[in-house]
Amino acid sequence: MNLPKHVAIIMDGNGRWGLKNKNSRNLGHKSGLKTVDKIIQSSIKQNIKYLTLYAFSTENWKRPKLEINFLLNLLKTFLKDKLPDLNQNGIKLRIIGDIKKFPKKIQTNLKTAETKTKKNTKLHLILALNYGSKFEIVNAIKLIKSKKIKISESMVNKYLYTKGLPNPDILIRTGNTNRLSNFL
């Protein structure tokens, strides 16, 4: 059986699930983070080489401030608690998206985690954070124009956050909604 090389997941519905089942959007997000561990371990077991998780979109900044802060704290906790596991399991972390909007401490932690895992090869874990595909394309075009380079498909690919990554073989969206949500 041929398994996909690259699985991309739009992590959606955790807040709605939490509100329905635990009377708290935040508890839903926390449960979703626990599921991430299972997905990562399953990806390794199935020899999937690339796993992209759409964890925080550019649109997520429109959520209530308390929910945003909770999500940012979950990200901080994930980075702090999981970095040793990433290395131990041979997982290379790569961030795609514009992380400049995140607090400086989180930016530093993200860059540190990428650096400390850069030689790992068992699984490439790509976290899409403050990511939107339209923003990604506009950003690539702006960078090309600033360098006064002729715009072409290959040049745009060179400046995308996703450069060097294979296209996803399968896209999964959790949460019972059928839309791409500005992803990849």
PLM region spans:
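Flexible, compositionally biased loop and terminal segments
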Residues: 1-183
